[in-house]
A protein has these predicted regions:
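Short, Lys/Arg-enriched N-terminal segments with co-localized hydrophobic residues
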Residues: 3-15
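Conserved, structured core segments of small domains
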Residues: 16-104
């Protein structure tokens, strides 16, 4: 039974689509994010350990965020993003989700 469960999870993971997320930080995000940063990073680590998050971070100018995620659909990813403390506290002010086809 355990083998079937592992196989099922692997199959579901392989069925997940990849998405690119591009968004914008609030003004003075570097300062405003500080009280929430530890909670944010801890959550992201858990999501990454679950193979949902591939990568996420700010652009060098720190005005924008860029990420790659595995998810079943855009609604699932939207829910995931909007449960993040950065979204709840207004550190992330908007975002767009794009289905992505990884060529290699």
């Amino acid at each position: 039974m355990q083998l079937l469960s592992i196989y099922s999870l692997y199959y579901l993971y392989k069925k997940m689509e990849k998405f690119v997320v591009f968004g914008r930080y609030c003004e003075d995000a570097i300062i405003k994010r500080e009280p929430f940063r530890e909670q944010h990073l801890k959550r992201l680590k858990n999501i990454k350990d679950s193979d949902i998050l591939v990568t996420l971070g700010p652009t060098k100018c720190t005005k924008y965020l860029f990420g790659i995620f595995n998810a079943n659909d855009t609604n699932e990813l939207k829910d995931l993003i909007e449960k993040d403390i950065y979204w709840e506290k207004g550190i992330w002010v908007n975002y767009d989700i794009y289905p992505w086809i990884q060529a290699f």
